[in-house]
Amino acid sequence: MFKLKRLGLFPSLLTSVQVLGAEKLLPRARKSDSVQFLYYRALYEFHGQKFKEAWDRFKETWNLLHLQDWSHRRRVAVYMTAIAICHGKCPTRDFMMKYKLDGDLKTISDSILSGNSKLFKKELDNRADVLHNSLNIYVFLLLNAQPALQLNLVKRTWKLTGKSKIITFEQIRKVAECMNLMEITKDQLECILINLIGKVLY
């Protein structure tokens, strides 16, 4: 109950959760109540660094929202897009334009997917004022984008080398030099490759 009280949910929903429990509440609740409950639950998971759980809750919220409910769908889309791009995925351009995310997140997304750390920092700084209106998104990208940047740099190197089975440290270092990125140490490279196993050969 402490979690729900911190989220500031309205009394009727809080009382229902106390009496019935969340799993029994949602199937019989009004749709608007279910949407609000799932959205705040997603935010709680997001701020608790449980991004997989947050993604699932945001997705459930999204599926319950009316197709014409643009403002609420955009609010959810911002979080889902931020989580997606830090995991190497990117929404379509049409999706980002529809919810007006192309101005704030499209170039940031492109920089992460290309593994371009320098461009990412530049775009994040350029959009700091806008993203600070949603401070949690700014901090999330600042703290969680680096692993995705490094992973995508290795993917890019792998593709440039003709998708060979072996990627050498020298190949990755050369790509980093060409892109004017910070030097990658052997320890960093080892961590990147460990995270890369099973994620590139698709």
Where are these regions (language model features)?
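Conserved binding/catalytic microenvironments
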Residues: 21, 25-34, 42
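Alpha-helical scaffold segments of alpha-solenoid architecture
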Residues: 34-180, 189, 193, 201
